[in-house]
Curated annotation (Swiss-Prot):
UniProt record similarity statement: Belongs to the UPF0354 family.
Identification of the protein by name: UPF0354 protein GTNG_2723
Disulphide-bridged cysteine pairs: none
Phylogenetic classification of the source organism: Bacteria, Bacillati, Bacillota, Bacilli, Bacillales
Spans through the membrane: none
Amino acid sequence: MNSRQMYETIKERLNAHPHWTFHFDAKHDTMRIEDHRTKKGVTISLPGVIAKWHEQKDEAVREIIYYVEETLKTMEETATLSGNERNIYPVIRSTSFPTETKEGVPLLHDDHTAETRIYYALDLGKTYRLIDEQMMEKEKWNRERVKEIARFNVRSLPTPVKEDRVADNVFYFVNTNDGYDASRILNDAFLAEMHTRMEGTMAIAVPHQDVLILADLRNDIGYDVLAQMTMSFFANGRVPITALSFLYENGKLEPIFILGKKRRT
């Protein structure tokens, strides 16, 4: 199954929606589904769907179909910030992610690291909507109000961790699948608490939106394992973020490149 074939498979399943248009981007291996009435839509990274298809077959296709249908259905509805304060969260995206909507409306965002940005989303249950300036102006909200509420809400999310050990290195995973696992990288208190558990160097990875990896690296093997693990998660994620990891030092995140047995370049 290649990207063109997956595009055709998804398109065939969604053809029952007469108002939707489809576009295949061979250069970026993506598919765009858009409602021509609203000019709003979603862009899918096809390699991630294909990787899941190799493991789950038709279940992977059904999952992406459900995601697209729910997302575009929600876009037809009017979403408001007022009254939904508890449903506003920050989301992490790569620096290649657009900073404005297809209509040219700026999305509310902040710099995070050299590899990542922070966007802000209104959770709508089965999907979410990224908050843009037009939405804020309409309700007379300012940027700081959105950010303050979002940061508070992400700190309120539970942070259950699963632990795995490889060659004396310890890896912790946050994987609740609530859509905001990667967002927990913004919970400074949680990161500081995890840092107290570390015996070696603390590293963090957010390969896609549904996982946060925290690593206690005690030898060179740990660096290699983290690099391979992060790349695998990145390739399989529905919303990929970055295949790079970060060192956590003095409350700061610094991207690291791991090549073979070398720790950083």
